[in-house]
Amino acid sequence: MKAFLVALVVAIELTLVFAGCPTIVSKNRWGGQQASQVQYTVKPLKYVIIHHTSTPTCTNEDDCSRRLVNIQDYHMNRLDFDDIGYNFMIGGDGQIYEGAGWHKEGAHARGWNSKSLGIGFIGDFQTNLPSSKQLDAGKKFLECAVEKGEIEDTYKLIGARTVRPTDSPGTLLFREIQTWRGFTRNP
């Protein structure tokens, strides 16, 4: 009985600690393929790199799932990546979608993949901001990643354009993330 009560208390504490964590739509649920090869990372990661997918946005799980299947197909079959390049993606519906996932190296920023978590906002944010649902989900996801010990408490948040020649994460999203916790121009 004592062991049961201890287990129950631990379960309740974990629920309270991670209560703010958004649900993550698994790769299996959105119809993604498994990676052809995996390189693992060591947590906690020091950097978070924000991207946009340069695609139309999506507003519900079915639409986002179709978009992700297409992105993964492009990454794996055209760019010869082992998986979709991002660790996680955030849809216009405000849901977090699993990409390469936790503890796995993405293919989103050459030279930075082993030490960063790559988050792709689904859409093109050169002239439009992501939805408020996307932005809120992004902030909550980062808080959750810190709470879970996946990224350092003093993580550095950067836009993809800071570490490689690209417009990503788009002009307006880049401007937005400059107001977020951990943002730096000089990683």
From Swiss-Prot:
Domain (N-acetylmuramoyl-L-alanine amidase): residue spans on this chain: 43-170
Tissue expression per record: Localizes to plasma (at protein level).
Domain of life: Eukaryota
Signal peptide extent: 1-19
Disulfide bonds: 21-144, 58-64
Gene Ontology CC annotations of this record: extracellular region
Sorted UniProt keywords: Disulfide bond, Immunity, Innate immunity, Secreted, Signal
UniProt record, GO biological process: innate immune response; peptidoglycan catabolic process
Annotated InterPro entries: Amidase/PGRP_sf, Amidase_domain, Peptidoglycan_recognition, PGRP, PGRP_domain_met/bac
Chief location category: secreted
Molecular-function annotations in GO: N-acetylmuramoyl-L-alanine amidase activity; peptidoglycan binding; zinc ion binding
SUPFAM superfamilies, per the entry: N-acetylmuramoyl-L-alanine amidase-like
Family: Belongs to the N-acetylmuramoyl-L-alanine amidase 2 family.
Protein task: Peptidoglycan-recognition protein probably involved in innate immunity by binding to peptidoglycans (PGN) of bacteria and activating the prophenoloxidase (proPO) cascade immune response. Binds to 1,3-beta-D-glucan and PGN.
Listed name of the protein: Peptidoglycan-recognition protein 2
Lineage of producing organism: Eukaryota, Metazoa, Ecdysozoa, Arthropoda, Hexapoda
